[in-house]
Amino acid sequence: MSESEQLLEKQQDHKWDAATHADKGITIKTGKIAVSSSDIPLRNRKGLLTWDQLEPWQQDNQYIISGYRPPSFSFYLCVKSIFHVHNESVNIWTHLFGAIVFLFFIFKSELILKRDTTTAEDVYVITVFLFSAFTMLGCSTFYHTISNHSDDVSKFGNKLDYLGIVVMIVGSFIPCLHYAFACHANFRTLYIGTIIGIGVIVASTCLLDRFRQPEWRPYRALIFVLMGLFGIFPVIHALKIFSFSEILVRMGLVWLLLQGLFYIVGAVIYALRIPEKWSPGKYDVFGSSHQWFHVCVIIAAFCHFHGVCIAYDYFHERRGCGEM
């Protein structure tokens, strides 16, 4: 660690001590909310900041009253904070765990692609999904780790976080569309090309500064949900070609529906800011809406993973298009 980083760490420790020993009579006011800092458990405040002590660029959810890391202006200190408890801890560790799991399968894809009839196309489409999941979870982990660095770095990380979501949605579609329309190449190309085009448009929107503003929270959730709901069209199309029972395994449809359910539930919780909206200050470190959103995303990603594996197995059990 350089001398400048050591100095920054000492300055940060001083800020944390100041926050810890702040007058117990302080009252935090956020809109119509008024919460006394004496009501916030000391374990949640030690070395951390409260809402009213934040810089404007750090303020996003007024119902999260405490547990904020001070601006660090140091990537080293941001990474070091991973091993401390604060209101980003759950967000960081849930998606870090998921990123590690998907990275493992990227390098150990033979654990999934076990069929003798596996082709280069199988390797490609499944690797695309695994990489997209890793990208989304990795970008999310990165953003929540460095979100307290500085205004500019936080903005960059936030945009990267949203781009990761777009990559995940597009990457999730590709293996499902590949196996659903494996024997209908024109339809497969049409749907894959369409979702990639939609992804480019949404990604461009994510780069706009206004997209990350707190008032855009419900619109962000809606845009990503609508992007995912594009999947309704190829499913309806596939039902006109195949029986419902066949679609269940050809696309791993049950698991895709479960994935969609968890994504939608997570997005609704995220947009409505529940449960912290009902009891500001109670869910600052554990149990806030963003944390539940992260849990839903992890579960959804693994549901989709299982569905893709079912589609892969079914395709090779039927020996490709030979028996279709």
Swiss-Prot record:
Residue ranges of the TM segments: 92-112, 123-143, 163-183, 189-209, 222-242, 252-272, 292-312
Source species of the chain: Schizosaccharomyces pombe (strain 972 / ATCC 24843)
Record's protein name: ADIPOR-like receptor SPBC12C2.09c
GO biological process: fatty acid metabolic process; intracellular zinc ion homeostasis
Extracellular side: 113-122, 184-188, 243-251, 313-324
Membrane topology: Multi-pass membrane protein
Function: Probable receptor, which may be involved in metabolic pathways that regulate lipid metabolism such as fatty acid oxidation.
InterPro entries: AdipoR/HlyIII-related
Cytoplasmic side: 1-91, 144-162, 210-221, 273-291
Compartments, as annotated in UniProt: Membrane
Molecular function (Gene Ontology), one example: metal ion binding
Disulfide-linked positions: none
Gene Ontology cellular component list: plasma membrane
Family: Belongs to the ADIPOR family.
Annotated keywords: Fatty acid metabolism, Lipid metabolism, Membrane, Receptor, Transmembrane, Transmembrane helix
Cross-referenced Pfam families: HlyIII
